[in-house]
From Swiss-Prot:
GO cellular component, one term: ATP-binding cassette (ABC) transporter complex
Organism: Agrobacterium fabrum (strain C58 / ATCC 33970)
Catalytic activity: sulfate(out) + ATP + H2O = sulfate(in) + ADP + phosphate + H(+); thiosulfate(out) + ATP + H2O = thiosulfate(in) + ADP + phosphate + H(+)
EC nos: 7.3.2.3
UniProt entry tagged with the keyword Translocase: yes
Lineage: Bacteria, Pseudomonadati, Pseudomonadota, Alphaproteobacteria, Hyphomicrobiales
Residues that coordinate or bind ATP: G35, P36, S37, G38, S39, G40, K41, T42
Enzyme class, broadest EC rank: translocase
Membrane topology: Peripheral membrane protein
Name this polypeptide is given: Sulfate/thiosulfate import ATP-binding protein CysA 2
Length: 341
């Protein structure tokens, strides 16, 4: 099922939550809506579901204008962060509930067979008689997904589905959800503020800020070609160095960096990931002093300050004996350069 949003707008009182958003989601695509709190990602998801109505624009499911279609008639499956399971029902009863109230009537035998099939799909065979309180958080989220799939939705919507779980469980469930999606091929949209989650799971990532789309693309595209300092900072650890562009070249103090810049002269911000920086005892890069060294498994994280006052973080091999107070240079191997706003 292809989904299309055309110039969608949503306002709560005087707050514009979604600003003129247009977006195409291809049939069978796994799409992540990624952004900080207040970026509009959950509001967009709720409008696709029919839980909120837009104040302007249109939403299409395939060729059908679904803008004003009630939620129960849209054919969506919804998974929330906090499971929303019925505590007084067994897992079997929770999964069966949607089928019992659906417009598509099934007899008990058909419902029981479908529940068994779904319990197998989410790897909870034999646990149908248990109650939600008797299983782990990760297992509850699997039940929530099985319940969403029980009504054979055209579209699967997930709102921060792993946010309430610990890091190791989240990683396991991410791999599992990707496998489920690949086997079923249902158009899936999920909301997250977790950059790693979006980049690990999605075919395409839509990055939002202040109610609008700021960039979209494959995980590779948005990571390698961030189009703004916001995207660069939001997607992961980023060091910022103040510089100047002059005559197509970039300088930090008197040090010329090995990058060209064609967007005119003036102040620029130079962004680099920790892995794009190297520490040298020789003074061939940006002069800096080591402020602190954090020892971690397999690496050492160095925090250094440049003579211009910028704070940089980068990693060195565990055998490197750099220590606080050392003087040296930071060499920037790769960077993204943006004009100062």
């Amino acid at each position: 099922m292809k989904i299309r949003l055309e110039n969608v707008v949503k306002t709560f009182d005087t707050f514009r939550a979604v600003r003129d958003v247009s977006l195409d989601i291809e049939s069978g695509e796994l799409l992540a809506l990624l952004g900080p709190s207040g970026s509009g990602k959950t509001t967009i998801l709720r409008m696709v579901a029919g839980l909120e109505y837009s104040d302007g624009g249109r939403i299409f499911f395939g060729d059908e204008d679904a803008t004003n279609i009630p939620v129960r008639d849209r054919g969506v499956g919804f998974v929330f962060q906090h499971y929303a399971l019925f505590p007084h029902m067994t897992l079997h009863e929770n999964i069966a509930f949607g089928m019992k109230v659906s417009k598509v009537k099934r007899d008990k035998a058909a419902i029981d067979a479908r529940v068994k099939e779904l319990l197998n799909l989410v790897k909870l065979d034999g646990l149908g008689d248990r109650f939600p309180a008797q299983i782990s958080g990760g297992q509850r989220q699997r039940v929530a997904l099985a319940r969403a799939l029980s009504v054979d939705p055209k579209v699967l919507l997930l709102d921060e589905p792993f946010g309430a779980l610990d890091a190791n469980v989240r990683r396991d469930l991410r791999r599992w959800l990707r496998e489920i999606h690949d086997s079923l091929g249902i158009t899936t949209i999920f909301v997250t503020h977790d950059q790693e989650e979006a980049l690990d799971l999605a075919d395409r990532v839509v990055i939002l800020n202040q109610g609008g789309i700021v960039q979209q693309g494959t995980p590779k595209e948005v990571c390698r070609q961030p189009n703004s300092s916001f995207v660069m900072r939001f997607l992961g650890d980023a060091n910022r160095v103040s510089g100047v562009a002059r005559g197509g070249k970039v300088y930090v103090g008197e040090n010329e960096l090995p990058f060209s810049y064609t967007q005119g002269d003036g102040a620029v911000d130079i962004y680099a990931r920790p892995g794009d920086l190297e520490w040298e005892d020789l003074h061939e890069g940006i002069p800096a002093s080591v402020e602190r060294v954090l020892d971690r498994a397999g690496e050492r994280r160095v925090i250094a300050s440049t003579d211009g006052g910028d704070i940089l973080e980068f990693d060195v091999p565990p055998e490197n004996d750099v220590t606080a107070g050392d003087r040296g240079s930071v060499i920037i191997r790769r960077a993204k350069i943006f004009p100062v706003a």
